[in-house]
Amino acid sequence: MHVEFPVDEKSLRYIETMEDDPDIKAVISILLDKRKEDFYNYASIVCFCYREQDLMNLPDVRHIPDKVKAWIKRKSFDQDPAYFTFFKHLFSLYSGFVQTYEGWDKLGKYRSVIPESYVYHRMREKYASRPEVKVERECFVVIDEWDSRTHRAKAEGQKVDVGVWDDIAQRGEVYEVKVKVYIKQKEHQLKFLEIIRKLSNKKVNVFLASFAPKNVVLQHLKAFFPGRDLSQINIMGVDELRNL
């Protein structure tokens, strides 16, 4: 089977420009440096805080888990350098946008780069010693004669956030990555993942990944798409990502 993930160079340059923002770069660097519980806590702050006011009143942010709030309090009391660097850059990023719905929408585009970059760099790290494994981002999908650029309209979605293919093992993975899963009007993204899995005869595992807990992701999906079969898509929440 022939599988490849041609990169959308224009889209990649756009993402990399946002990734070069000093605040984004610092936040991603800290997330990549953390594992397990620390990663869970840092990622949860990114997930559940979407405006400057949230960062100014972390104990009052309703959806942040209590154990994360306790961790924040401890890190603040200990004056942990990594935590203060993370918070400084995250606050700088958030406060750089007008605190209106329009500003939060623009900020959301920058926030969305954070989990996508995390997954991409984790995959690059995982397969660094295996040159036969190709890891791409902002990429189209080609499976034998099927090409997402010609077989799907732009409105349906033609790209995945991250694509991985091992030509020797004939196995791969694709990831659609979100900060939180709010795709009420984007069922086509789920269908795209299912099509990839089907056309590859299940040789490409498909993932919907988020910084939100898996149970929250599933609650959202079931609320948005009642009765929809979700069994073809692997759901990864913050717990799964911290062990990626």
Q: Where are the language model's segments positioned?
A:
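Intrinsically disordered, low-complexity Ser/Thr/Pro/Gly-rich regulatory segments
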Residues: 1-244
